[in-house]
Amino acid sequence: MTPRIWLYPLLAWLLFAWPLKTLAKDSIEQQGDTLQYAIPAVALAATLFYEDGYDGSIQWLKAVVTTETTVYVLKKSVHKERPNGNCCSAFPSGHAATAFTGAAFIQRRYGWGYGVPAYLVAAYVGYTRIESDKHDTTDVAAGALIGILSSYYFVEPYKGIKITPYAANGSYGLMFTGRW
């Protein structure tokens, strides 16, 4: 794979300088603001630097665009008041949706070994939204579900065996597919 040299400074800033600057501050809300973007940024960086070709990057883009579009439409349609009394864009949590899209992408594409830490950080982002009184648990859970479903719909494992639930014509089971 040929490295894309022009991306190194941007990714260094996205992955290290920007999060560390914000995480150094006291505000739990600011931590969630930063980490919601850091997780998908790491996922995109993995597709650009680890993989050959652009299949992973395209899958990442589809998952992210689907998540953000779904969140935008629901926020404009539902008009739910936030727990802090601000009107009217609480449902679903966009921060949780973005973070969980990145975490589910990492897990789905590269496996649970990378996915578990990503999900833990995404769960912390959801916690920051509840703790800062921007969302309730339902808002965060809905955002997380949107992000996870978007990634699961578009993302395929990078290498190895894929296990997919199967249900059709009264038959149920697991389907195993692989890339060699």
List each model region and its residues.
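Interfacial segments of alpha-helical transmembrane regions
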Residues: 46-66
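Hydrophobic core of alpha-helical transmembrane segments in multi-pass integral membrane proteins
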Residues: 39-47
